Structures are given as structure tokens and as C-alpha cells.
């Protein structure tokens, strides 16, 4: 039986493209035919919900009833994947809350697959975020994402820097999100549809649209590049991990040898 998976997308800095990454993931999971539900913590407007209204609910991640709404239903929902788009500044508090409620421990025991996409900013301060995040991870699958939004220039990590920070998370894997042509990004934003829907020249309702052939081509190439990154790191295999068979409860029953006749 496939374990429920929780995918967290966050970063403590704003303007690093967390929701853009979340949108590419929702399209990717749909393409892989994985049932997914999403929670948008950008209260009250809900940016992710604007693009994926059918699978997304807006919640206040600091509000205990909303935490219950997400995590109490992880095992009972029909969705294989629960995706959470964490608003800027709330990644560390959210991880702290997950540790306090026992979620991190449940992931460590193998009851839940926990995946974290940590969207890094371009400054050296992001390295401190990595250190802070490492304290909460447990056995989570940790992806460090460089999102080249707005021609962002990322600092280069030399060997000493890598040794000092990255060794704290031995299983960390890097993912690169390229920049989408600005006009294409603007048109998808104006259309308020998923990237895959824009590529298919459809409106949110499913009706045919008249988006630019050129811009759809740019979005298709960009999204294919990102999906290739997700394939490279084996994201689908991670999400579809199965529960380990549990040992029998109690002592094994004795084997009774039947006498030969």
C-alpha cells in the first residue's frame, strides 16, 4: 500500500517563487496521474488557489483547527499527495509545529512520506535558512531549489561553504528552476490557469482559448525542463513509496507437527 505523502514548499524569504514551484508540482503530479490536494497558506487571497481552484483550499497554517484540517486527514483522504504552499516567513514556524505534533516522528517511522522543497533566495542568508531547516527534517526528502525568477543571480558555493552547510543534510538534493520568458509568465498569470492548461490552449472552464502559439511554446519548453528535473531526482518514486510490512503483533503461534500415519 502506498504511503500518504506530504509535500511542503517554502522558504523564509519572500519573492523567491514558492507558489510558482508549487504550480509546476501540481501540474507534474496530475501528469503522473497522482491524486493530489493542495493547501494555500496565503491567507486570505490564496495565490495558488487562483490557478488551481478545484484542488486547493486556503488555510491559516498558524491556526490549530486548520492544522487539524490538513494533518488529521492525511491518512483518510483519497489523495495520494497533500501539497502545502507555505507563505513567506512561515517555513521555520511550520516545521516547528510539525515536530511538536509528532508529524516529523511519524515520517521517521515510515508512516508518512515527507518531502520538503526549500526555495532558496539569492543571498548568503539562505545558507542560514538551511541550517535552521536541518534541525527539523528528520528523515524527510529534502530538495534545495534555486528558482531563477527575474534573472536572479545566485551566489556560488565553494567547497568550504558546501562542507560547512550541506553536510548537515546528507541526503539533500539540488533542483534548478529556469526563468520563464517574462511575457509568457505574464500571460499565464492573466489567464489564471495552470501552466499545463495554458499549454493546451484551454480556459479554466475547459473551453477553448486563443493564447499565443509562441508563448505556449515557451511555457511548454520551460515546464518540460522542470519536469525533467523532477524525473532526475526520482520524485514519483519517492511519492509512490510503499509502506514497509509491519512485524506481527505478539508472539508467533507455535508450529504443530502432525504425526505421520
Which residues make up each language-model segment?
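Catalytic cores of phosphodiester-bond-cleaving enzymes
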Residues: 1, 125, 137, 210, ...
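Walker A (P-loop) phosphate-binding loop of P-loop NTPases
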Residues: 14-15
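Conserved catalytic-core segment of NTP-binding enzymes
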Residues: 89-189
